[in-house]
Amino acid sequence: MTMMDMNFKYCHKIMKKHSKSFSYAFDLLPEDQRKAVWAIYAVCRKIDDSIDVYGDIQFLNQIKEDIQSIEKYPYEYHHFQSDRRIMMALQHVAQHKNIAFQSFYNLIDTVYKDQHFTMFETDAELFGYCYGVAGTVGEVLTPILSDHETHQTYDVARRLGESLQLINILRDVGEDFENERIYFSKQRLKQYEVDIAEVYQNGVNNHYIDLWEYYAAIAEKDFRDVMDQIKVFSIEAQPIIELAARIYIEILDEVRQANYTLHERVFVEKRKKAKLFHEINSKYHRI
């Protein structure tokens, strides 16, 4: 195993640890594509964790400087400051793919702002956040998952990322509240007459369910729109993207089956993932 192979293996471990659903799906890509996904996921995870886990703004700055070095001089040797193994893997990817570096910087800017979290006044602010933390990831992955990236390809990948982030929010309402965060907008909370603290303390009510389903309908519509345009991605990537997205959309039904609980994180069981895999395998005849 070469040093570069070890770098990619390190990135893969990060992906498997933090997103079993993504790993389950994207590990089915051809080797070069899945390695690129591992590297990009690992970079994005380190960006997220720099503040959420480490509380280290200097580390986030180092990540940004390392990415800037790769963008400016992709073929030169660099003394990376953040995580050398991840950055070497990203540099290798950047030498072969047209990486959307600005999307990395947009993600970093969102993480900067997230240090001083305040509730969103409107849904527009919420959806802007979903773009910043997840739509950006879709943009960065676009050259990996398509043969000829176009404006439409970037748009579809961005919407998929935003949809998956909204699903994360719908899954983690209780956990986020425990961390003193409420992502639903004040505008929508007022409209549906919902107080998250009250729901957390006293249990789910019809007002909360209606609010939750309002946002779930948005995520489900975006999912359907993405599936309708799945052919913008490469033949190899189409079934993988559909598998990842369908596993994620299943999370919404898991929340429903758990009676919209705020006190337990739901997940999609392995047998359901396997069932989806076989359905999509039959549809595409190529996974």
From Swiss-Prot:
Binds 2 Mg(2+) ions per subunit. A third Mg(2+) ion binds between the 2 farnesyl diphosphate (FPP). GO terms for molecular function: geranylgeranyl diphosphate synthase activity; metal ion binding; squalene synthase [NAD(P)H] activity. One of its GO terms (biological process) is carotenoid biosynthetic process. Pathway: Carotenoid biosynthesis; staphyloxanthin biosynthesis; staphyloxanthin from farnesyl diphosphate: step 1/5. Its EC number is 2.5.1.96. It catalyses: 2 (2E,6E)-farnesyl diphosphate = 15-cis-4,4'-diapophytoene + 2 diphosphate. Mg(2+) 2 binds at residues 168, 172. This is 4,4'-diapophytoene synthase. It comes from Staphylococcus aureus.
